[in-house]
């Protein structure tokens, strides 16, 4: 961690602390630099390549450093749980369970046929999964599957890579999603329903990080077969 000083050469290996009231368009020149912004400020002053941790409110230095340390601890603990889950007999459920406190929203995964592969938390407003009589597995309701097949926006989402947003037009709430690809083939989708808290910009990177572990599991364990 370093205190930001105007005019100093910034390095990607450091996290720079800056106060929101000192932000200006001059910050646009920085690329691939990580900042902690304390207090209110115009975050559009940063390039999209920069990583931003925004701490709102008026805090003392000790409070700021404590919040930064707590954030690092939370993500370090999450990473450790994802790593451990790689060797588990039930990696997908363990990974999604560990991710609930990162997204603060329900997280689930489904395959190409809308079979539910993992859904560790169900909250009010979510779709009610049903048991497929043929396979005995949980699956999205047939009516919802038909709605998706007829929805032009949903059809466009089937070719995307990385984390993206599916709008609230059909479901009544936004869904942060990431398609899962292995060897160029679509394997399913990882979803975060925006039902409990607002999706934050950092959740996009977090979902891609989680997705990379799940794609690795697919290769190792044939999870979606």
Question: Where do the language-model regions lie?
Answer:
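Hydrophobic, helix-rich cores of sensory/ligand-binding and other regulatory modules
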Residues: 1-225
């Amino acid at each position: 961690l370093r205190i930001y000083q105007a005019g100093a050469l910034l390095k990607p290996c450091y996290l720079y602390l800056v106060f929101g009231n000192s932000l200006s368009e001059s910050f646009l020149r920085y690329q691939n630099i990580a900042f902690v912004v304390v207090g209110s400020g115009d975050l559009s002053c940063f390039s999209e390549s920069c990583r931003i941790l925004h701490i709102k409110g008026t805090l003392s230095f000790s409070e700021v450093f404590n919040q930064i340390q707590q954030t690092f601890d939370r993500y370090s603990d999450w990473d450790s749980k994802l790593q451990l889950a790689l060797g588990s007999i039930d990696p997908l459920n363990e990974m999604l369970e560990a991710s609930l406190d990162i997204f603060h929203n329900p997280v689930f995964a489904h395959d190409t046929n809308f079979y539910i592969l993992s859904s560790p938390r169900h909250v009010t407003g979510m779709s009610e999964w049903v048991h497929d009589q043929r396979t005995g597995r949980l699956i999205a309701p047939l009516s919802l599957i038909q709605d998706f097949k007829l929805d032009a926006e949903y059809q466009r989402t089937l070719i995307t890579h990385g984390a993206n947003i599916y709008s609230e037009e059909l479901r009544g709430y936004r869904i942060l999603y990431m398609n899962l690809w292995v060897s160029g083939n679509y394997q399913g989708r990882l979803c975060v329903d925006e039902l409990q808290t607002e999706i934050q910009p950092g959740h996009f990177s977090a979902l891609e990080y989680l997705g990379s572990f799940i794609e690795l599991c697919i290769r190792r364990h044939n999870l979606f077969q």
